[in-house]
Design a protein with these regions (language model features):
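Basic, Lys/Arg- and aromatic-enriched nucleic-acid-binding interface segment
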Residues: 6-64, 68
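Major-groove DNA-contacting interfaces characterized by cationic-aromatic clusters
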Residues: 19-22, 107-148
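Extended, non-catalytic subsegments within catalytic or DNA/protein-binding/adaptor domains
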Residues: 2-6, 26, 147, 158
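Conserved tyrosine-mediated DNA breakage-rejoining catalytic core shared by Y-recombinases
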Residues: 13-14, 69-111
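Proline-centered turn/helix-capping motifs that create local helix->coil transitions or kinks
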Residues: 2-9, 113-119
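Short, basic (Lys/Arg/His-rich) helix/loop patches that form interaction surfaces
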Residues: 42-44, 137-140, 144-166
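Feature representing long, continuous alpha-helical segments
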Residues: 34, 57, 65, 80, ...
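Catalytic-site neighborhood detector that most strongly recognizes the C-terminal catalytic loop/helix
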Residues: 19, 27, 84-90, 129
């Protein structure tokens, strides 16, 4: 069951070939990163979403879904510890990811986060009673807001469009 004859296999040279995407440059230079990190706006909302982008960056490119699911109980011995939501239900590749809570991360948490109680989410977007559809909508909204503010910052700094996809 589940085995096909070699003659029926649809993939390979001269048969169906899976197209590879054209790569695009996603990296930022150290100079560009410094400009983003140093950027200050008079608009508090812009600063908030820039800080969330920096949080994502400093947490090894944490997925926004995972970032919004983080609780204070996920901070253990000065490290944020989590399993990617994308892989948490698989038995293989269920690797715990760790990010050191640097002074910059701690500043972002202190400035924009909830009260530091173990059961509290770090950031005030999830409440804990949302349905899967509501959680997805919250994540989509936060990503949209981060991307909107980072696009403005990127334009102002002459970097171009900066997004959560890093």
């Amino acid at each position: 069951a589940g085995v096909i004859k070699e003659s029926q296999y649809p993939f390979g040279k001269g048969l169906f070939e899976i197209k590879t995407g054209i790569g695009r440059k996603k990296g930022l230079t150290k100079k560009q990163l410094k400009a983003i990190f140093d950027y200050k706006s008079e608009n508090e909302t812009t600063n908030r979403y820039k800080d969330l982008w920096i949080f994502i960056y400093l947490c090894n490119g944490i997925n926004p879904t995972d970032m919004l699911k983080l609780k204070f109980s996920d901070i253990v011995d000065g490290e944020i510890c989590f399993v990617r939501q994308k892989t948490e239900r698989t038995t293989k590749n269920r690797k715990e990811i760790r990010a050191v809570v640097s002074s910059q991360l701690q500043t972002i948490i202190d400035k924009w986060g909830n009260k530091p109680l173990p059961d509290n989410y770090i950031f005030p977007y999830m409440k804990g009673h949302e349905t899967a559809i509501e959680r997805k909508a919250i994540v989509r909204d936060v990503v949209k807001r981060i991307n909107k503010r980072m696009k403005l910052i990127g334009e102002e700094l002459g970097i171009g469009n900066i997004t959560t996809y890093i």
